Design a protein with these regions (language model features):
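Active-site-facing substrate-recognition patch
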Residues: 43-110
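Solvent-exposed alpha-helices and their adjacent loops that cap or buttress functional pockets
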Residues: 76, 160-164, 191, 211-212
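Short helix-loop-beta connector
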Residues: 109-113, 163-165
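Short glycine-rich phosphate-binding loop at a beta-alpha junction
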Residues: 112-121, 199
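Short, glycine/charge-rich flexible loops or terminal/linker lids adjacent to PRPP-binding catalytic cores
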Residues: 126-169, 176-182
Length: 231
């Protein structure tokens, strides 16, 4: 078999037609420019997450799976005709990534590098945000605030990377009285952190927002009772 050898023009023509550059071919500036242009075209077709679609789908899932109708007693002691069980959402394989991305977008204007809250409601929310940040090529640490300090080991109340001297976000799935996020915020401040805000997935409109304001904490939420069809 006789192999036909190509000159520089032939090699360039074959490469530009879509094949790999020939072995031994020295890349010129124009070649590099062509390669970068192709890379830009390819990456432009990699769709970024559509936050509006994420939010809409998350709302759909919350309405379908998390709202329980019937008489229930809330943590405040008051009775309600419904209950929003968001752990069915934050621990769900489809919904959790949506929670992470939507909560990140909700707090995108805030400066913080760690997120956490009082166990248990805050834990999956914070972890979802950690994974959403990692998927975006960013780092976000998570911390867990125990309901009481350990009586053994290091006897620490906050688990995870140190938050001393750091700006942190307190999260919760939902809050009725605001007690859990406030307790977590106090623990974080005692550990040397600066709390930038409190953020939840759903606001029940039962006074938590007012409690946060009294404590000097900014507060934001993804969904209101109107969004959930409960008001």
């Amino acid at each position: 078999m006789i192999e036909k050898r190509l000159g520089p023009q032939g090699m360039a023509k074959r490469w530009k037609s879509g094949s790999e550059p020939p072995v031994g071919h020295t890349l010129r500036g124009s070649d590099l420019g062509t390669g970068l242009a192709r890379l830009a075209v390819v990456t432009s077709h990699i769709a970024a997450p559509d936050i509006d679609a994420d939010r809409a789908r998350l709302l759909e899932i919350v309405k379908d799976r998390a709202i329980v109708h019937g008489k229930v007693t809330l943590s405040s002691g008051k009775e309600a005709d419904y209950y929003v069980e968001l752990r069915r959402i934050t621990l769900d394989g489809e919904a959790a990534p949506l929670v992470g991305r939507v909560m990140r977008e909700l707090t995108d204007d805030l400066e913080f590098d760690a997120v956490g809250g009082l166990t248990l409601g805050a834990d999956p929310v914070a972890t979802a945000m950690l994974h959403a940040a990692a998927a975006a090529g960013e780092r976000l640490d998570v911390f867990v605030v125990r309901k009481a300090g350990k009586a053994h080991g290091l006897q620490q109340r906050i688990e995870g990377p140190s938050i001393r001297g750091r700006r942190v976000l307190i999260v919760e799935d939902t809050s009725t009285t605001g007690a859990s996020p406030l307790e977590a915020a106090t623990a974080a401040q005692e550990a040397g952190a600066t709390v930038v805000a409190v953020a939840t997935i759903a606001d029940r409109a039962t006074g938590a927002g007012e409690k946060f304001a009294e404590a000097g904490l900014a507060y934001r939420h993804v969904f209101s009772l109107i969004d959930l069809g409960l008001a």
